[in-house]
Regions:
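N-terminal compositionally biased, intrinsically disordered segments and leader/signal-like regions
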Residues: 17, 44-48, 106
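N-terminal export signals
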Residues: 24-28, 39-61
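Compositionally biased, intrinsically disordered low-complexity regions enriched in proline and serine
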Residues: 22, 41, 80-83
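N-terminal secretory signal peptides
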Residues: 1-39
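Residue-level detector of intrinsically disordered/flexible regions characterized by low predicted structural confidence
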Residues: 20, 44, 88-89
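Intrinsic-disorder/low-complexity coil detector
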Residues: 6, 11, 22, 28, ...
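A cross-kingdom marker for long, charged
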Residues: 64-84, 88-369
C-alpha cells in the first residue's frame, strides 16, 4: 500500500457482501449528537470494571450474577433478551463463514460485521434496555480511565458512540463457547470469556484514531493513541548507533500483514534480548502503554501469551523510515513483534493499529486492510 492511499478510502469488498451489508462512506459528514446514556454508564461500566454492581442497574443483572458482573455476563443477558427475529440478524453459529472467511475471526480497519444502518447499536433494531447492555459491556472491555478517550475517538471517527457500530454474537452464551464482536470505523473488539483457544482478546483486534482529519499533522495533536508511539520513540532515543541501525528499517510492511511468521523466518528489527537493563525497563513501559486501554483480564492474557513464548525478550522492535510525517525523525510507523505477538502501529496519515497476540504461532490471521 502506498502512502498516498489508505484502507479508509479504499473500502474492502467485504463491505458490499450478502446479508444486507452496505458500503461505508468514510468521509461523509455525520451527525454529531451523542446517543449514549451517560447517567447509566456512570454506574454500569464503572461497576463492571470494578467487579461490583450498583443497585442502579437491577434491570440488567440478576441478583445471582451481581457477584460477577463482567462483560461476559452482559453478553449472556443480551443474548437472552433478543427476539428470534433479532437473533436471525446478529447471531451466528460458531463456525459461520462468508466471503470474509471465518467471520468471528475477521479484522479490518473500517468494517461492519452486520448492517451498520439497519442494525446499528444505537438504532431502533435494539430496545433501550438492550442498548444499555451493549454500551455497558462494550465499555467494560476497557480500562475505566480510558472511557472518555474511547468516547473521543468514536466521536472524531464515527460521529459518536452508537452512530455506526454494529455487533454479532457467535455460538451460544449459554454454553462456554461464545464470542461477541463489535465493529466500526477504527474498531474491532471482542468479548469471549476466554472460550477462543490460544488467543488474547478473543482474536485479533484493531484500533485507530483520526483526531484532526484524515491527514494528521506530525504532532498528531489530540490523538488518544499517539502517546504509544512517543513512548516507543523514547526507547529509540535510548539506543546507541549500532542498535538504532538494527532497529531502523527502510520500508514498512503492509499494515494488515500482522500474521505470525513461519518457524525459521527471522523477524526484522532489534531484539529486545540485546537491550541493556534500563532499555529493557523502557521496553516494558512500551508494552504497558500498548495494553493499558484494556481491562485487566485482557492485559493479563496478553502477558500470559507473551510468557508462553519467551516473554518480551523474544520480541523485536522495528521503526520504519517510510512515512515519517514532517521528516522529523519521530517515527510514525513502528512494530513490536515476536513469535506469537504482533503490534503494528501505523501513524501516517493517521493512526491505525493492528493487534494479533496468541500463545501458539499456528493460529491463522483473517485480516483485510
Amino acid at each position: 500500500m502506498s502512502l498516498d492511499s489508505c484502507p479508509d478510502c479504499e473500502m474492502p469488498v467485504a463491505q458490499t457482501l450478502n446479508s444486507g451489508h452496505r458500503p461505508v462512506e468514510v468521509d461523509a459528514p455525520m451527525d454529531s449528537g451523542d446517543l449514549s446514556r451517560r447517567g447509566f454508564m456512570k454506574t454500569a461500566t464503572a461497576t463492571a470494571a470494578a467487579m461490583s454492581v450498583s443497585a442502579a442497574v437491577p434491570r440488567i443483572l440478576s441478583a445471582r450474577e451481581e457477584a460477577k458482573p463482567t462483560s461476559e455476563n452482559l453478553v449472556k443477558k443480551l443474548y437472552e433478551s433478543l427476539s428470534d427475529k433479532q437473533k436471525a440478524e446478529v447471531c451466528f453459529s460458531w463456525d459461520h463463514t462468508d466471503d470474509r472467511g471465518l467471520l468471528r475471526t475477521h479484522v479490518s480497519n473500517n468494517w461492519n460485521i452486520t448492517d451498520e444502518k439497519e442494525l446499528a447499536i444505537g438504532g431502533s433494531f435494539f430496545t433501550r434496555n438492550q442498548q444499555d447492555m451493549i454500551e455497558a459491556l462494550f465499555f467494560g472491555l476497557y480500562n475505566p480511565d480510558w472511557h472518555s478517550k474511547i468516547r473521543k475517538q468514536l466521536q472524531d471517527d464515527a460521529g459518536g458512540y452508537g452512530k455506526s457500530q454494529s455487533i454479532a454474537i457467535f455460538g451460544s452464551p449459554a454454553s462456554d463457547k461464545f464470542e461477541f464482536v463489535m465493529t466500526g470505523r477504527h474498531l474491532t473488539i471482542r468479548c469471549d470469556g476466554n472460550s477462543t483457544e490460544h488467543v488474547a482478546f478473543g482474536g485479533p483486534i484493531f484500533y485507530g484514531h483520526a483526531a484532526s482529519g484524515f491527514n494528521e499533522p506530525a504532532s498528531h495533536e489530540g490523538n488518544v493513541y499517539w502517546h504509544q508511539a512517543l513512548k516507543a520513540n523514547g526507547l529509540y532515543k535510548m539506543l546507541d548507533g549500532k542498535q538504532q541501525q538494527k532497529a531502523l528499517i527502510e520500508k514498512a510492511p503492509h499494515e494488515a500483514a500482522a500474521g505470525f511468521r513461519e518457524k525459521g523466518i527471522e523477524i526484522p528489527g532489534l531484539p529486545i534480548l540485546e537491550l541493556s537493563a534500563d532499555q529493557k525497563s523502557h521496553a516494558q513501559e512500551v508494552l504497558q502503554a500498548l495494553i493499558e486501554p484494556y481491562r485487566t483480564s485482557d492485559q493479563d492474557e496478553v502477558k500470559k501469551c507473551l510468557a508462553a513464548n519467551g516473554g518480551l525478550d523474544q520480541c523485536r522492535l522495528a521503526f520504519y523510515k517510510s512515512g515519517d510525517l514532517g521528516d522529523d525523525g519521530v517515527w510514525d510507523n513502528w512494530r513490536l513483534e515476536g513469535p506469537t505477538f504482533v503490534w503494528h502501529f501505523r501513524g501516517n496519515p493517521h493512526v491505525h493499529v493492528w493487534v494479533n497476540v496468541a500463545d501458539n504461532a499456528s493460529v491463522p490471521l483473517n485480516a483485510r486492510g
